Amino acid sequence: MQLNLSFVHKSLTVLLFLNILTPAAVVSQESLIISKISGTVNFDGTPNEEAWNETTVFPMIVSTPNFGTEPSELSEVMIGYDQEYLWIGARLFSKDPSNITSTSKKRDEESRNSDSFGIILDTYDDNENALAFFTMPSGARIDYSVSNDGEGGGGSSRGSINRSWNTFWDVETSRDELGWYVEMRIPFSSLRFQTINGKIRMGMILNRRISYMNEMVTYPIIDPKYGFSANLKPSLAQTIEFENIEPHNPVYISPYVIGGYSSNWDLNDAETLYQKEDKPKLEAGLDVKYSLTSNL
């Protein structure tokens, strides 16, 4: 994969800016403006289109195990948006691609033994609730909701992490001799947010897990002193800002078919023999979801 020199310059500039800040100052009270893109993204898991040069670039720093140090591997993360989607692109380099691990393609099956990349969005910027979108090199989609500022842990539908939550979004990944790559597109119609004076503010955390180093790198800097799930806590997110997004209220239609089969043995009228009666069952229908507004 060829690197864009203007992108590298932007990355180094942002990284230099990050290094002169104290950790407490990185999560600024000021929101960061996300760039709107005008170009077209060929959604194939390789973020190399010209449109990615219009995006906002985010550096990443080690959260664990060696807080605040330089990551063992280079990460280039870009975020932009258009009227329909929030776009996230990541170039996740590896000095030895054989170290890249992906354990599953199954939806919502996340593993700490796998490399992963994802974004946490506190869509109301309330420091309490958030939505998580993750993937692995296999391209698996992993999404869940966070409540109570990530306190209390939890598995599926327990505690503060609800892994049964799903929504509509897409991800594509690719890999080569330099590392692995991610393109995510999240419809704004799949998010709940508020527009105030034409602006939308959300909290954001970026996460990359480098499995062979057992290393978690984040943006912004996340101090592990805040607990095991510190990298999921909305209260530690960086506020980002979008402008002039027109809300969409789409209708999602999911057809379903439910089949079944049962057998009964009944005594005949003469009460001399049991006869088998097969009863196949088939039920079909549609699940329809419609949001009245962007914040309901």
Sequence positions of predicted segments:
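Glycine-centered signal
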Residues: 6, 25-26
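Structural preference for beta-rich elements and adjacent junctions enriched in aromatics
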Residues: 27-296
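N-terminal secretory signal peptides that target proteins for export/translocation
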Residues: 1-8
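Bacterial N-terminal signal peptides
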Residues: 10-23
